[in-house]
Amino acid sequence: MANPSLLILAGDGIGPEVMAEVKRIIGWFGEKRGVSFDVSEDLVGGAAYDAHGTPLADETMARAQEVDAVLLGAVGGPKYDVLDFSVKPERGLLRLRKEMDLYANLRPAQCFDALADFSSLKRDIVAGLDIMIVRELTSGVYFGEPRGIFPDNEGGRFGVNTQRYTTEEIRRVARSAFELARRRNNRVCSMEKANVMESGILWREEVQWVHDNEYPDVELSHMYADNGAMQLVRWPRQFDVIVTDNLFGDILSDCAAMLTGSLGMLPSASLGAPMANGRPKALYEPVHGSAPDIAGQGKANPIACILSFAMALRYSFDMGEEATRLEKAVETVLADGVRTADLMGPEGGTPVSTSGMGDAVLAALDASL
């Protein structure tokens, strides 16, 4: 049986640094657990532009379509701000998402007990928090036509963006949310603005249809997105899986991210339609950006990238036990007080570099055997 295939795109800024720690962990799984991967590497973002004049080469795109999963570090940096919009580093990531048709963006928001005091909310509100936000990624107001800025008849201008969703676009992301809920606590909350938007009415009706016809065993609730934002701050532990559209998902997932204490801790997955092996096309990446201000200094927190690989183990490689092993290793390291610079607080801890955090996670993995 062939080894699972993984394409690594380290990208820009701190991307190569945090990805280096993931590659060490991949090596650990091969050596200590007999779990081997066919790993290939390529360029994306600014690094690809510097080498090829494009943020994503056609050959890289073709390889991404062939592998079981893609793991990306980060893209972008101030040196590329002068580039035309069509070749900015971020366009490489957007092309991956679009051409792989990655329509379901998974953003977990988990608050590790050791970091509960880093949250902007009180410990008793966020302790034990474990939410999964499923954001529709390829449709909605970011992609709808018509769009643009146009002159009006009074010497001014007006801007237009179009929120557009089809039945199938809503149903497929709803199915992703219900499938995830079955693996978790079996609850889905769908968020929209059905009180003021026709697209919200359609969203609510289609999510309800998927529930009634395909997932009646999963508990479903509906909530207006503005109330959802308030509830995330008021009582976030009421949620298990949240499913919402592109715009609201963009906002709500960032809101949920700050409940956890540090963007350096948060992984993400973008999933598409099932491949021949029954598993979805997938791109995994940390939520944080390229952080050019600390690149090359050994200060970056690699945990978000490490946990992104854990998501790949679970959702692309069907290795849930190994994913849990890696997640528990991270939890152990944090409980032991090991901290990169972004996690250092008044209570102190053991300060470590990027590679030092990788060392600690590898030691915890060894201890798990």
Swiss-Prot record:
Q: In which pathway does it act?
A: Amino-acid biosynthesis; L-leucine biosynthesis; L-leucine from 3-methyl-2-oxobutanoate: step 3/4
| Chief location of this protein within or outside the cell | cytoplasm
The note on the cofactor says: Binds 1 Mg(2+) or Mn(2+) ion per subunit.
**EC number(s) given by UniProt:** 1.1.1.85
Catalysis performed (reactions): (2R,3S)-3-isopropylmalate + NAD(+) = 4-methyl-2-oxopentanoate + CO2 + NADH
Name the coenzymes or cofactors required.
Answer: Mg(2+); Mn(2+)
Write the protein's name.
3-isopropylmalate dehydrogenase
